[in-house]
């Protein structure tokens, strides 16, 4: 498991004074500010953040060292990370998305179905996007106790009982 967890991303600039549009991936979106300073994926660049206001789909924020609209524009797409040990501990039945990505998915009979490509949420519940050599296109598996009875992070595997006809 990675020591860095992605907690947000820069969606672009906001205004003309160097603010950015910040999208938070935290369960409580405002909590992203508690993890300041954030880093880039390599952990080398550090960005102190201050949220300035809520906006549609996120926040306007000041990132340390960003003073102009052009500098803010250049950061569009930047994913922002914090150290895993700064995040709250999760109950046994909850997982950080980053820990699920890359896990192999097996059915209850032990047949490999594929690997988790991403975790998505379209409003109702999380969905695991499963891809693999035997699949024509990725499959979205509901991330529920019924469809995914076992997640074993130590063995890097998921046991799934997918709805009939999904695979």
From Swiss-Prot:
Membership in a protein family: Belongs to the RimM family.
Compartment annotation: Cytoplasm
Pfam family, one: PRC_RimM
Entry keyword Chaperone: yes
Subunit structure comment from the entry: Binds ribosomal protein uS19.
Protein name: Ribosome maturation factor RimM
GO CC terms, sorted: cytoplasm; ribosome
Originating organism: Ruegeria pomeroyi (strain ATCC 700808 / DSM 15171 / DSS-3)
Function of the molecule: An accessory protein needed during the final step in the assembly of 30S ribosomal subunit, possibly for assembly of the head region. Essential for efficient processing of 16S rRNA. May be needed both before and after RbfA during the maturation of 16S rRNA. It has affinity for free ribosomal 30S subunits but not for 70S ribosomes.
Ranges for domain PRC barrel: 92-166
Gene (UniProt): rimM
Main location, first listed in the record: cytoplasm
Description of its domains: The PRC barrel domain binds ribosomal protein uS19.
Keyword Cytoplasm (UniProt): yes
InterPro entries, per the entry: PRC_barrel-like_sf (IPR011033), PRC_RimM (IPR056792), RimM (IPR011961), RimM_N (IPR002676), RimM_N_sf (IPR036976), Transl_B-barrel_sf (IPR009000)
């Amino acid at each position: 498991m990675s020591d860095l967890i992605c907690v947000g991303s820069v969606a672009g600039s906001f205004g003309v004074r160097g603010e950015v549009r910040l999208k938070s991936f935290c369960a409580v979106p405002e909590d992203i500010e508690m993890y300041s300073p954030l880093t880039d994926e390599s952990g080398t660049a550090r960005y102190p953040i201050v949220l300035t206001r809520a906006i549609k789909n996120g926040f306007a924020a000041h990132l340390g060292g960003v003073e102009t609209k052009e500098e803010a524009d250049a950061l569009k797409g930047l994913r922002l990370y914090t150290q895993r040990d700064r995040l709250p501990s999760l109950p046994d039945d909850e997982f950080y998305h980053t820990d699920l990505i890359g896990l192999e998915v097996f059915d209850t009979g032990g047949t490999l179905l594929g690997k988790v490509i991403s975790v998505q949420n379209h409003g109702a519940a999380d969905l695991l996007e499963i891809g693999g050599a035997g699949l024509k296109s990725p499959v979205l598996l509901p991330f529920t106790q019924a469809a995914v009875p076992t997640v074993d992070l130590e063995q890097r595997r998921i046991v799934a009982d997918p709805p009939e006809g999904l695979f």
